[in-house]
Amino acid sequence: GKRKVFYAVSGLVIGIGIFSMVTRGFNWGVDFTGGRTYVVAFDQPVEANAVQAALEPVFRGEDGRQYTTSVKSYGGAKQMKITTNYLIDLPGTATDSLVDVRLQKGLGDLGTGFAWPAKESRKVDPTISDDIQTKAWTSVLFALIFMFIYIAIRFSNWQYGVGALLSLVHDTLFTLGLYSILWGVVGFSLEIDEAFIAVILTVIGYSINDTVVVFDRIREYMHDHKRDPVVTVFNKAINSTLSRTINTGFCTLLVLLIIFFFGGLSIKGFVFGLFFGILVGTYSSIFVASAIAVDLLKDREPAAVAKPVTA
């Protein structure tokens, strides 16, 4: 009976996320943009803006082109993550060595000691990044389509398939919006890269599993209570499986919380996305997927039970 409330809450949260996607955009990783990324440790705390200002002159082409460079703190003020597309279109080890030399020169101009080689370094060619991006989003699209088909066939009703599909889209948009709103705000990386696609696919898989459990119970109750109104049957079925769904979600979230606080910095963004994605996936499997399904099935209300005729 609270479907409109849940629709409003979900619509508001998703709307804020979409607004952020349009206005702020995303922190695209080199997997999707192409470029080089380095994690450099310094002897003393440094400002990200100061590091970027020192690198911009050295990452300028001979034709005057200013290549894109971004610098973000990575686990504290003594460690920076540097990303640049400087000479990324030119292949060869000589180019790689030149970029390393230019980077060291720019960092040396800061006057602060730093460790070299970099703690982490990675290079992704533009053609490879385009291919990665296409395959990544295609995998998400196919996952959504196949989940819709699976649910529709399993429960012999397209209404269930639509409910499951829209709840998965809801979870995906929520996670995208979260990354858009919080990148640059939290103290760890929230890049849109291959790891993020793994987050989305994991959330989709977890959410659809929860949804199947709820829909199975609904189907069972629909079979046993054929004379009851559809909304009443849905409410009874959801209430009967509510504790199981919440307990399962709580145990999963507890494990992720422990990994987040005690795991390394490099996986914090991944675990962060999983935590909130699974949290909203648990919510949507109960309050979004079933709400949409019941609205689509309301035209199947049972006919009134005829009263027996007495002589």
Task: Pin down the residues of each PLM region.
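A structural signal for conserved, well-ordered secondary-structure elements
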Residues: 1-311
